[in-house]
From Swiss-Prot:
<feature type="region of interest" description="Disordered">
    <location>
        <begin position="532"/>
        <end position="604"/>
    </location>
</feature>
<feature type="region of interest" description="Disordered">
    <location>
        <begin position="478"/>
        <end position="499"/>
    </location>
</feature>
<dbReference type="GO" id="GO:0016567">
    <property type="term" value="P:protein ubiquitination"/>
</dbReference>
<feature type="compositionally biased region" description="Low complexity">
    <location>
        <begin position="541"/>
        <end position="558"/>
    </location>
</feature>
<keyword id="KW-0833">Ubl conjugation pathway</keyword>
<comment type="similarity">
    <text>Belongs to the NPH3 family.</text>
</comment>
<dbReference type="InterPro" id="IPR043454">
    <property type="entry name" value="NPH3/RPT2-like"/>
</dbReference>
<feature type="compositionally biased region" description="Basic residues">
    <location>
        <begin position="591"/>
        <end position="604"/>
    </location>
</feature>
<dbReference type="InterPro" id="IPR027356">
    <property type="entry name" value="NPH3_dom"/>
</dbReference>
<protein>
    <recommendedName>
        <fullName>BTB/POZ domain-containing protein SR1IP1</fullName>
    </recommendedName>
</protein>
<comment type="pathway">
    <text>Protein modification; protein ubiquitination.</text>
</comment>
<dbReference type="InterPro" id="IPR011333">
    <property type="entry name" value="SKP1/BTB/POZ_sf"/>
</dbReference>
<keyword id="KW-0597">Phosphoprotein</keyword>
<feature type="modified residue" description="Phosphotyrosine">
    <location>
        <position position="415"/>
    </location>
</feature>
<keyword id="KW-0175">Coiled coil</keyword>
<feature type="domain" description="BTB">
    <location>
        <begin position="27"/>
        <end position="96"/>
    </location>
</feature>
<dbReference type="GO" id="GO:0009904">
    <property type="term" value="P:chloroplast accumulation movement"/>
</dbReference>
Amino acid sequence: MSAKKKDLLSSAMKRTSEWISSQEVSSDVTVHVGEASFSLHKFPLMSKCGFIKKLVSESSKDSDSTVIKIPDIPGGSEAFELAAKFCYGINFDMSTENIAMLRCAAEYLEMTEEHSVENLVVRAEAYLNEVALKSLSSSITVLHKSEKLLPIAERVKLVSRCIDAIAYMTCQESHFCSPSSSNSGNNEVVVQQQSKQPVVDWWAEDLTVLRIDSFQRVLIAMMARGFKQYGLGPVLMLYAQKSLRGLEIFGKGMKKIEPKQEHEKRVILETIVSLLPREKNAMSVSFLSMLLRAAIFLETTVACRLDLENRMGLQLGQAVLDDLLIPSYSFTGDHSMFDTDTVQRILMNYLEFEVEGVRLSNNGVDLAGDMERVGKLLENYMAEIASDRNVSLQKFIGLAELIPEQSRVTEDGMYRAVDIYLKAHPNMSDVERKKVCSLMDCQKLSREACAHAAQNDRLPVQTIVQVLYYEQQRLRGEVTNDSDSPAPPPPQPAAVLPPKLSSYTDELSKLKRENQDLKLELLKMKMKLKEFEKESEKKTSSSTISTNPSSPISTASTGKPPLPRKSFINSVSKKLGKLNPFSITPYNGRGRTKPPKDRRHSIS
């Protein structure tokens, strides 16, 4: 049919539709759309809707009135009403709120050029291309409305066009986008500068209305156009805060969430974690801690939780105490309040990153300061969890063993944690109290801490004697230094190290790094051994066969402390201790060196 004939036919149909409306001709077709019913006329509908034309021709011709049902039209009765108005020539407004359902309904009803000139499909496409997809906020609105119109919105490529328009315009608006990729080595420096003053673009709040799958596709399209991944941090933070709102991740109450809603939030969280920037300092530790709490609460995949733990370990030097106080979310009374196992894994990750940083960087001052901050943080954390009576001795000692020895200038923080733990667990045996007190080096206690420890009746006698002995040695040294204080030697010119001494220093630093590596390997083996022992205990307790009284489990049930056993870890530790020719004390499994005994003043 030629274009001229189509125009003539369209004009005739329009005049006929207007005449039907003006003369109030009785309806001859009833259309049921969901729960709504429309009494209409066949001619205006069939002249523009190929789908209705098929339904009318297939219906019975005997009856004067035809009844047809359209149960699954996109947009429901609202969309069909607008399409019917278009068929009758009644004016209505197209907007960003209704253009998505109009376009999908027109596709469903087959309102194409084959049936009428300038039909609804063409009119809707013109509005999309000329108005809706020309602004960022309108494109986001159309995409949001299209989420309820799948799969037909995908078929007409409405979703993909909206996503492409959003990605293009966000890259034009934001300063995080550059067509050429910058040097990857400079990423960390840039992120450190951005993290101090995070920039949130005006469109970030608009993106939070999207469903998680649409949100993910938009961010991926933005990165494909050159948007820097570390610039997505504020956007992800806004989306997570809005979508995960209402979760009881800071309390210890029972879960108050429906299974369906829990599944939806779990998918949202796992997707957000997969989109997090890989650069260091791109996200704050507090935000990562919030995500980790939610991941434990929602029981996400293990990979999701381990990813968050690795990220927190990488930035542990920036954390505060509240970031580590993660509830255990165990709803039985025999579990500790805080999840110490998670913190233990975070600290393990931190130690691995620090060892790798020592190898790759010569800036030892920054690493030492960072490690000192982590040491103080862990001491405060241990003091916080020490008051919990459900924290076992094994967990308390295991955490203390992981605190780097070089990070603790004084032992006051560890003494405070030990004292709180002894006060909260008054029924411990003498052997157990000695184990707890062996975590601190009495030689590094300050004068105030020594004065408190000397009068602390919760400490074992041996520990009090050590404190008094070292305090006596300190006073004796101070008196000797005051009486025999020589004149300061004249300043000497800086001497250049001889080649032999320089090589000796290099060898010594190399051996120190090797010792640190061996410590980490031992800690990993201990963690694996503890997990294996926990699994074997669970299997033994669940079996119906009676346990052998001589087994370690039956010994623990009698209430008596188990005898020390020779394990593979202990044997490896003793062998590794002999590898160091410079008498650098290797990691002894407790994170502390025992004070040397003075045979003339030994009391034990």
